[in-house]
Regions:
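ADP-ribose/NAD+-binding catalytic cleft of ART/PARP-like enzymes
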Residues: 1-30, 37, 44
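Conserved NAD+-utilizing ADP-ribose enzyme module
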Residues: 24-27, 36-156
């Protein structure tokens, strides 16, 4: 069984210890395989910061290798497959940025190994490889009240 990591707010620590990780956005639990390269394992933390999380925690857990999970690149079609197959595809990918793993069930407290504080969020913002590219000015991509949103709308 591989060790997996779910990034959340440190404020959820007590609830997670008591009741496990409950499905949130889209009724799923997002996670990544735990790797030596923290940038890859924690790549979603910086994106989560945009939604108001200030202090982060990494929840390490294990689920059976043959469990069905969803896997794919951000904003692309995801496939349902066994965890071990998804991890194998991920580990062999040339570019590991932007991949998502999620499961459509609760992670039970007995499956949790440990919860640890992450010192600061790392990873990409908006989308992988966005650094140095101008943001898309379409209304779907621009968030109301976002950084330089007004300026981007005027420059269209």
């Amino acid at each position: 069984m591989a060790v997996l990591v779910h990034i959340t707010s440190i404020e959820n620590e007590a609830a997670i210890k008591r009741a496990g990780i409950k499905p949130g956005y889209r009724n799923v639990v997002f996670f990544m395989p735990h790797m030596k390269d923290c940038f890859i394992s924690h790549q979603w933390a910086r994106e989560l910061k945009r939604f108001g999380i200030k202090n982060f925690a990494a929840v390490d857990f294990k689920i059976p290798d043959d469990e069905e999970i969803w896997f794919g690149k951000y904003h692309l079609q995801h496939e349902k497959m066994e965890l071990n197959k998804a991890i194998s595809l991920f580990m062999n990918a040339e570019d590991k940025l932007g991949y998502e793993f999620f499961i459509d069930r609760k992670i039970e407290p007995r499956e949790i190994i440990k919860i640890r504080k992450i010192p600061k969020p790392m990873g990409w913002r908006y989308q992988p490889h966005a650094h140095g590219k101008k943001p898309c000015p379409c209304p779907r991509c621009l968030q109301a009240g976002g950084y330089k949103t007004k300026k981007l709308k005027v420059s269209q």
